[in-house]
Amino acid sequence: MAIFRDRTDKQVDHDRAIEDKRRHRQLVEKSIKENLGDILSEESIVGQSKNKKFKIPIKSIKEYQFVYGKNSKGVATGTGEEKRGDKIESGSKKAMGKGNKGAGNEEGDEIYETEITLDELMEYISDELNLPNLDEKKYSEIITDSCGKKKGYQRHGIRPRLAKKRTVMAKISRKQSKKRALIEEGKDYKTERFPFREEDLRYYKVKMQPKKASNAVMIFIMDASGSMDSTKKYLARSYFFVLSRFLKRKYNNIAFEFIYHTTIAKRVSEYEFFHKSESGGTYISSGIVEAIKLIDEKYPPSEWNIYPVYASDGDNWSEDNVKAIESVKEICKISNMFGYAELLPSTYTQTMYYKFNKEINEKNFISVVIKEKKDLWEALKTMLKQELKED
């Protein structure tokens, strides 16, 4: 016969705080992904430090509880695609009050705001954005994220680095010391329970070591002509700024070059690129040709992974269209990837996005259209998502 012992008074309660923290982090990550378009397209994001804070709305975590139903008939069934926390309703459900649709009578969700820094934002999206694989080039100089190696032990650390064997050894050593002390005092040491204590815990000490990778250069090219109004320019700068911040996190010493153009192209500093404005006509070819010259002078394709990215509203002087197409074909031959981002394009004329996609068949040519601010995040993912990694 089975014997059941009541040990409830001796049980250690489960730490619910750990589970709540995990669920809170999931809500934060979900909310960040849902609001990324608005955050990344903020004009104020450009030029901000890593400690710049952004507010994110998050639904509160409710405790599980049984509640009375509405005595409605039928059985609620799911579709198989539900996620944890989703409600399965039977029949139609009255909508909650929404703007311009009258007042509702349903209980709403509790929403509060939390703040994250720009640096934390980059950390959240780093799992989804990945630079295409860097080919092994000659004379590697770029240092990527450091890799950690175990170098000894320490008394404080995080749980994943807990050294279990060393912890047990520390406990045994303490137990033996106490055993000797009790024997000297003439006490019975066998009756004493001997649980683990905080002082027994040992953690691996991890030393970060830099890891070398292949050379990589990002060349940012922006149309600064008169057709690029302030909204388009802010959107382009936000696009490039987030891209540069992410890549600087992933590759510590990655090289960046900045070019902006009207009918003529100029190489500028990072500060000028993100803050200076010009006006004039548009020769798209001028920016591409300047990038090709830059590559010839400083970045041999045999030694460097080259990623030019160009942003424009797609308007170009018609006599320059053929030269622009030929320039893009040429730069594709010497680059690992060439990205073309078209911002808030005109709906009245056929833009360069359609001309490029019709005439350019190179596999390393990637084009995206940003028709509104919320498209910015999807454009970034398309340009750099993991599926674009080269074989």
UniProtKB/Swiss-Prot annotation:
Q: Short name of one Pfam family for this protein? A: DUF444
Where are the compositionally biased (Basic and acidic residues) regions?
80-92
- Region span, Disordered: 1-23, 75-107
Q: InterPro entries, from UniProt? A: Spore_YhbH, UPF0229, vWFA_dom_sf
Q: Which family does it belong to?
A: Belongs to the UPF0229 family.
Query: Protein name, please?
Result: UPF0229 protein CLL_A3091
